[in-house]
């Protein structure tokens, strides 16, 4: 079964045409699964952690192992080492050490989360297809005018084919709410971070094949 999505044919800065394009309901009409999306997005964010945090415990701190003073008779609190965590420049009580936070993401779960997110974007009218987004010059103002024909929202993710136009990259570099990704770079986190997602019409078939 096929779904109909709007595809914008942007001819110039003022006018554009809109046609309906058939897409697979197995990708863009997938049931919404918030629990699966949460699990995959959490795993993606955890996998971004470096895990390089390191602190020194009392065994790692440099210093003498000699007892500072005798146990009794001085009137001061007993102490066994200058490297004690309660001393200044001493070690940390439960020192953090480098470790891996990697979580495995199954392919079937990843595809299900991607299809669920794309379908939710379609249902919320936040995903559109565009035929092309050619810029004559690398001007941010030109890009904003063309995007304004499609949506008034400034938070936009543009997904292109593997060859990204250089002018498009330069024009969007001044806009922190507009990002240009190719088909191989998108992931569940990037899809949910933007209010509007624009897909090039040429990548729809490849995207459906990848997620089928």
UniProtKB/Swiss-Prot annotation:
Residues 54-85 are annotated as: Disordered. The keyword RNA-binding applies. Gene3D superfamilies: 3.40.1370.10. The keyword DNA repair does not apply. Pfam families: Ribosomal_L4. One of its GO terms (cellular component) is ribosome. InterPro entries: Ribosomal_uL4 (IPR002136), Ribosomal_uL4-like (IPR013005), Ribosomal_uL4_dom_sf (IPR023574). Residues 54-65 have a biased composition (Polar residues). One of its GO terms (biological process) is translation. GO terms for molecular function: rRNA binding; structural constituent of ribosome. Keywords: Ribonucleoprotein, Ribosomal protein, RNA-binding, rRNA-binding. Part of the 50S ribosomal subunit. One of the primary rRNA binding proteins, this protein initially binds near the 5'-end of the 23S rRNA. It is important during the early stages of 50S assembly. It makes multiple contacts with different domains of the 23S rRNA in the assembled 50S subunit and ribosome. Forms part of the polypeptide exit tunnel. PANTHER family: 50S RIBOSOMAL PROTEIN L4, LARGE RIBOSOMAL SUBUNIT PROTEIN UL4M. This is Large ribosomal subunit protein uL4.
């Amino acid at each position: 079964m096929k779904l109909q999505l709007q595809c914008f044919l942007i001819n110039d800065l003022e006018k554009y045409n809109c046609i309906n394009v058939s897409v697979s309901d197995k990708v863009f009409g997938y049931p919404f699964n918030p629990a699966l999306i949460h699990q995959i997005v959490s795993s993606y964010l955890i996998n971004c952690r470096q895990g390089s945090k390191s602190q020194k415990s009392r065994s790692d701190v440099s210093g003498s192992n000699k007892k500072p003073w005798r146990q009794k008779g001085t009137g001061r609190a007993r102490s066994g080492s200058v490297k004690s965590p309660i001393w200044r420049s001493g070690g940390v009580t439960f020192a953090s050490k480098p470790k891996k936070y990697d979580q495995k993401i199954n392919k079937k779960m990843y595809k299900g989360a991607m299809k669920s997110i794309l379908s939710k974007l379609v249902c919320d009218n936040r995903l559109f297809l565009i035929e092309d987004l050619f810029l004559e010059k690398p001007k941010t103002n030109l890009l904003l005018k063309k995007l304004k024909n499609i949506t008034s929202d400034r938070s936009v993710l543009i997904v292109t084919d593997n060859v990204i136009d250089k002018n498009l990259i330069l024009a969007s570099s001044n806009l922190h709410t507009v990002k240009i990704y190719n088909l191989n770079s998108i992931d569940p986190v990037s899809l949910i971070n933007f209010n509007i997602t624009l897909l090039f019409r040429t990548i729809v078939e490849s995207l459906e094949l990848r997620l089928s």
